[in-house]
Structures are given as structure tokens and as C-alpha cells.
């Protein structure tokens, strides 16, 4: 059995952690002496009344590395340090963990020092720290000063591609590589790209890039959104997701919740019962276990 991860969580982050865990589909309860206990098939996360946070389970290592540290524990340390004025390209995605709606991937190319200085003058930061109104406003600023590209994979296309790749990380690598290839200068010279490390091995993205016509070097790291160009890309990806969700809701006359929570499953069951499996498949990611749970509940 692995050793539990233990830390103390600032009270200001309690609500954020609870909301994000619900969005990710964790089942929340409140045993005695706790603020909440959250469970998934591979991770148990307990926040005690004292503020002590305990994480354990076979999936805890990935949970901490790819979610807890970059999205929760380091949220309050997102203050800018030294300005990096090296020309570079940033890429990020939105919608990966949302049952309903598309997967959106965006890239931003800041070509020179002037462009980067303009970005540093704004309130650009990781899109997870911004509300929808701030996202939409900052997206206009980013487009006015940078070269940008956005890919929106609506559920119908997303499900088709997932059927081809059979793996979310390989699909993400293909999409990231496509955006990087579209924006990278030729020759790339000293320009480089930065991407979040979404797979356990850097080779997944590198293999996808080898199939493209670019020689640009890529840095992959956890918490890549702390770089202002990646943060700008995360804002454009989130803007695309917000806009695409609105279009889906209007097209199907439905209100679609974000994330993968119990509410999402409830709405999914309602859509299946009233509109059928075909419509549900056009608005959700069918490889999510939530899809099978919804369909199984209807046939039970």
C-alpha cells in the first residue's frame, strides 16, 4: 500500500477543491470530523475540519501530479516572477474532463519582445482562475497582439477521432501537434513551444510532432499554464469551449452542465429518456464511463 499524501489546505481553497472534484465525477460525503470526503475508483481524498488534506489510492500519484498540484495547491502561487521575453509558442486545451461538449485546443505565438511585454501588461493567467466574462474579454486582447489558432472538436468529430486513436493522450498529442505545426515559423530558429505534460511520457507528443512538417523544439512540463503564453492559449481554448457549449445548447434546446458530476449524469439520463441515445451521442464524449452508466441505467 502506498503512503498517503498529507498536506494542509488553506481555507480559501476548500471550496475550489470541492467544486473541481465534483466536476471530475468524485462522489462526495461528509463523515464526522471532515469538511468532505471525495472518492473515485482509484483515489480517496479527505479534507478534515482542521484543514488537513489526505490523498491515497492507486491513482493518487497521477491525481497529485496532474491535478492537485497544478490546479489547487499552486493556485495561490501564480504571481508572475521574472518576465521571459523569448519568442515562443504556447498550447493548451479545454473540455478534456467535461462529459458534455467539445474538446478545444488553442495555440498562441508571441513572436517578439514587444508582443510579450504587451501580454505581461494584461491580467492574463491560467484560465481556471478566471470567470467566463474575464475569459471572453482577455481573448480579444490576445487575438489583437498574437498569432493564434484554435481547434474545436465537437462531440461527433471527437468521438470519431477517439474511435481512431483509442487513447485520449494520443488524441491530445495529435491535436497539440497540429496546432503547433500551424503556428510554428519556418525555419523555427530560436522559437520554441511549451505544452502541458498531459501524458506520463513526453514521447507521446514528440511522436505526433515527428509526423508534422516542423523542426520546432518543445518543452513539456506540469503546470505549463504558469507561462504567460500557455496561459494565453488556455484562455483561447476556454473561450472556444464556452462558445461551443452555447451553440450546442441552442442547437438542441438543452442546458448542459460542465464537468462530470452527479448532476451531469442526471441530465444525461433525462436527455437519453426524452431524446434518445443518438442525440446524447451528439453532445457528449461517449468513451466516458458516464455514458455507459447512463445507458445501462436506462436498460436496467
Curated annotation (Swiss-Prot):
State the CDD domains in the record: RNase_HII_bacteria_HIII_like (cd06590), RNAse_HIII_N (cd14796)
Q: Care to name a GO molecular-function term for this sequence? A: magnesium ion binding
Which cofactor does this sequence's record say it needs?
A: Mn(2+); Mg(2+)
Give the matching PROSITE patterns: RNASE_H_2
Q: What is the top-level taxon of the source organism?
A: Bacteria
The chemistry this enzyme catalyses reads:
Endonucleolytic cleavage to 5'-phosphomonoester
Q: Which GO terms describe its biological process?
A: DNA replication, removal of RNA primer; mismatch repair
Residues bound to a divalent metal cation: 92-93, 196
RNase H type-2 domain sequence ranges: 86-300
Q: What is its EC number?
A: 3.1.26.4
HAMAP family in alphabetical order: RNase_HIII
Role noted for this protein: Endonuclease that specifically degrades the RNA of RNA-DNA hybrids.
Q: What is this protein called?
A: Ribonuclease HIII
Q: Which organism is it from?
A: Chlamydia caviae (strain ATCC VR-813 / DSM 19441 / 03DC25 / GPIC) (Chlamydophila caviae)
The beginning of the lineage is:
Bacteria, Pseudomonadati, Chlamydiota, Chlamydiia, Chlamydiales
Amino acid at each position: 500500500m502506498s503512503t498517503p499524501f498529507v498536506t494542509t489546505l488553506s481555507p480559501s481553497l476548500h471550496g475550489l477543491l470541492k467544486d473541481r472534484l465534483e466536476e471530475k465525477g468524485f462522489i462526495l460525503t461528509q463523515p464526522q470530523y471532515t469538511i468532505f470526503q471525495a472518492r473515485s475508483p482509484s483515489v480517496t481524498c479527505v479534507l478534515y475540519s482542521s484543514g488537513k488534506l489526505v490523498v491515497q489510492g492507486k491513482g493518487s500519484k497521477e491525481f497529485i501530479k496532474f491535478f492537485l498540484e497544478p490546479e489547487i495547491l499552486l493556485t495561490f502561487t501564480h504571481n508572475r516572477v521574472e518576465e521571459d521575453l523569448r519568442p515562443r509558442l504556447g498550447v493548451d486545451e479545454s473540455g478534456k474532463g467535461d462529459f458534455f461538449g467539445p474538446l478545444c485546443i488553442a495555440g498562441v505565438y508571441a513572436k517578439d519582445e514587444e508582443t510579450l511585454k504587451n501580454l505581461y501588461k494584461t491580467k492574463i493567467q491560467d484560465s481556471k482562475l478566471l470567470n467566463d466574462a474575464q475569459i471572453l474579454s482577455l481573448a480579444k486582447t490576445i487575438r489583437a497582439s498574437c498569432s493564434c489558432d484554435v481547434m474545436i472538436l465537437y462531440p461527433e468529430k471527437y468521438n470519431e477521432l477517439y474511435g481512431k486513436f483509442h487513447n485520449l493522450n494520443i488524441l491530445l498529442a495529435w491535436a497539440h501537434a497540429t496546432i503547433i505545426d500551424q503556428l510554428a515559423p519556418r525555419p523555427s530558429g530560436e522559437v520554441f513551444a511549451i505544452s502541458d505534460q498531459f501524458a506520463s511520457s513526453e514521447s507521446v507528443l514528440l511522436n505526433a510532432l515527428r509526423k508534422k512538417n516542423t523542426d520546432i523544439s518543445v518543452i513539456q512540463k506540469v503546470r505549463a499554464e504558469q507561462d504567460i503564453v500557455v496561459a494565453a492559449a488556455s484562455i483561447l481554448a476556454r473561450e472556444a469551449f464556452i462558445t461551443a457549449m452555447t451553440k450546442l445548447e441552442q442547437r438542441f434546446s438543452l442546458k448542459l452542465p460542465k464537468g462530470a458530476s452527479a448532476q451531469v449524469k442526471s441530465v444525461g439520463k433525462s436527455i437519453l429518456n426524452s431524446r434518445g441515445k443518438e442525440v446524447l451521442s451528439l453532445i457528449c464524449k461517449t468513451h466516458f464511463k458516464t455514458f455507459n452508466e447512463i445507458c445501462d441505467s436506462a436498460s436496467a
